[in-house]
């Protein structure tokens, strides 16, 4: 099957299932089971319940999908530092 035939949807992760699978509520209202794409596994991108994601699906099986992108959260005040990381100190140049 060619990549041009895949359909993309956006949704919200509602539940984390075993074996790197997720239950996703699509914006259209349908609920599907999606697995993590290989590039997300390789780059160790973690997905939690409540994250907005983009799903790729085959038009032949609309019950399963591949999670290809996790959208950045829009929480205010984000500094970009990992959670739990100590604050960085100021350095003076000589």
Curated annotation (Swiss-Prot):
<dbReference type="InterPro" id="IPR012340">
    <property type="entry name" value="NA-bd_OB-fold"/>
</dbReference>
<feature type="region of interest" description="Disordered">
    <location>
        <begin position="71"/>
        <end position="94"/>
    </location>
</feature>
<dbReference type="InterPro" id="IPR004368">
    <property type="entry name" value="TIF_IF1"/>
</dbReference>
<dbReference type="InterPro" id="IPR006196">
    <property type="entry name" value="RNA-binding_domain_S1_IF1"/>
</dbReference>
<feature type="domain" description="S1-like">
    <location>
        <begin position="1"/>
        <end position="72"/>
    </location>
</feature>
<keyword id="KW-0648">Protein biosynthesis</keyword>
<keyword id="KW-0963">Cytoplasm</keyword>
<comment type="similarity">
    <text>Belongs to the IF-1 family.</text>
</comment>
<keyword id="KW-0396">Initiation factor</keyword>
<protein>
    <recommendedName>
        <fullName>Translation initiation factor IF-1</fullName>
    </recommendedName>
</protein>
<keyword id="KW-0694">RNA-binding</keyword>
<dbReference type="GO" id="GO:0019843">
    <property type="term" value="F:rRNA binding"/>
</dbReference>
<comment type="subunit">
    <text>Component of the 30S ribosomal translation pre-initiation complex which assembles on the 30S ribosome in the order IF-2 and IF-3, IF-1 and N-formylmethionyl-tRNA(fMet); mRNA recruitment can occur at any time during PIC assembly.</text>
</comment>
<dbReference type="GO" id="GO:0005829">
    <property type="term" value="C:cytosol"/>
</dbReference>
<keyword id="KW-0699">rRNA-binding</keyword>
<dbReference type="GO" id="GO:0043022">
    <property type="term" value="F:ribosome binding"/>
</dbReference>
<dbReference type="Pfam" id="PF01176">
    <property type="entry name" value="eIF-1a"/>
</dbReference>
<dbReference type="GO" id="GO:0003743">
    <property type="term" value="F:translation initiation factor activity"/>
</dbReference>
<comment type="function">
    <text>One of the essential components for the initiation of protein synthesis. Stabilizes the binding of IF-2 and IF-3 on the 30S subunit to which N-formylmethionyl-tRNA(fMet) subsequently binds. Helps modulate mRNA selection, yielding the 30S pre-initiation complex (PIC). Upon addition of the 50S ribosomal subunit IF-1, IF-2 and IF-3 are released leaving the mature 70S translation initiation complex.</text>
</comment>
<feature type="compositionally biased region" description="Low complexity">
    <location>
        <begin position="82"/>
        <end position="94"/>
    </location>
</feature>
